Each structure stands twice: as structure tokens, then as C-alpha cells.
Amino acid sequence: MKVYYSLWPLFFMVILPLWMASCYQAPEFPVVPKIDFESVNFKQGATGFDTLIVRVRFQDGDGDLGLGGEENDPPYHSLNFLPSPDGDPCRFSERFDEGCRDVLPPEFNCVDYQYFTTLGQDTIRDTLYVELNPNQNNFMVDIMTKKNGQFEVFNMRELLCVNPLYGRFPPLKDNFSVDGPLEGVIEFKPPSSAYMALFRNDTLKLRIQIKDRALHDSNVIESCEFTLNELLEVGGCPQRP
């Protein structure tokens, strides 16, 4: 199975506690990261791009948190390609050929197919069947909308053919060969011109998860309920009991 790499934009800030730069006794945490919701805010921009500001607290026992934008080798690559019988990626025009037809969906969609002009050093200009690698990002936010009293995930990729609010926060220490606990706050600020157009009148929640370098998934948390106008009026949505 071949892999492909791409870089994702970064809109992160990380706040670490004072004990990390002092003589205080370091705490002990599990090696699987744990997160807690802190707040969500919304800022309207003068240039047409608004910003959703998500803050979570984290703890991790061995401190293997963060991915650099240049870390694109497996297991952090972005895409997998299912090969045709000759070993090359299956192309849309070959989807019914022997060897491809059993793995390719019959209809075009923007989740399973992507158009490429180049692949590595090769010029291809073709549509290829791809599988998204769930390990390419380490901070995942899903927007959920309330319908008939129940929250459901708004699937940006399937409905709009755009990437969801997933990204990478940078490495939180210089040397990952030395284990040590980490805790702090991660702030994710993805900009978009579509927030108000899509969700102006909706009641929303956020579903959030992070992943460490060993591919341990944290617990999944949810934000408080909010509307974008409420965030503008009250200045944010903290966690409520």
C-alpha cells in the first residue's frame, strides 16, 4: 500500500505549567493522554474570516505529544493508495478493471477520490482512489448540530467536500527519547469564512479528541451547547456543571 503526504495549516497555541521550568516535583499521569474541555469562543474578523477558538486542558504521562509539519513519513502520512495489479495507485478510469473493482466504490465522491496533478516526482493528472489516514493529525474537532433534540456530527468532508477541523499541534518538547509528564492547555483557532453561513441559527456542540505520537487516542470530550451569536454576546462558553 502506497502512502502520500500533505501538510495541514497550524493554528495552535500551547500553554505549559510553571513546574516544567522549576524545581517542583513533577506529577504522575497515565501514558494515554487525558483532556478536559475548558472553553470555546468565536471572533468575527474584519477580512471575512471568522475564528473559532477551542481550549482544552491535557495531561500525558510520558510527554510524547505533538507533530511537526515535516513529519510526513508513516505512520503520520495523510493518504493511503490502494494499488492496482501493476502496483500503481488505482485510477478512477480503472475502477472496474480486475484488481481494482473489488476495492473501489462505484461512484465518484470527494471522500474516496482525489484529483492529483503530481504524485511524488511523477506527473499524473488523474483522479485516484484514496484512504484517509486517521493518524495524520493529533487534534480533532467535530462540529455537532442539534436536530430534533439530538446532536449529530456535521460531516464537512461528505457534505461540503472540505476538510474538518482537524490539525496538528507542534512538538511539546525537544527530546522525545526522554520520557516525562506534560500538562497544560492547547488552544486551537481554525479560521473560516463559512461559520456564520453554515451555522448561524444552529445550536452546536464540539466533540474533541487528541492523539499522542504513539497513536494513543485520548478520551473524547464534548463542549457546552452554544450558538455562534451567544458566543459573540457573552464572550465565550466555559464548562458548566
Residue ranges and their predicted role:
Residues 1-11:
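Bacterial N-terminal signal peptides that target proteins for export
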Residues 18-22:
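C-terminal motif of bacterial Sec signal peptides marking the signal peptidase cleavage site
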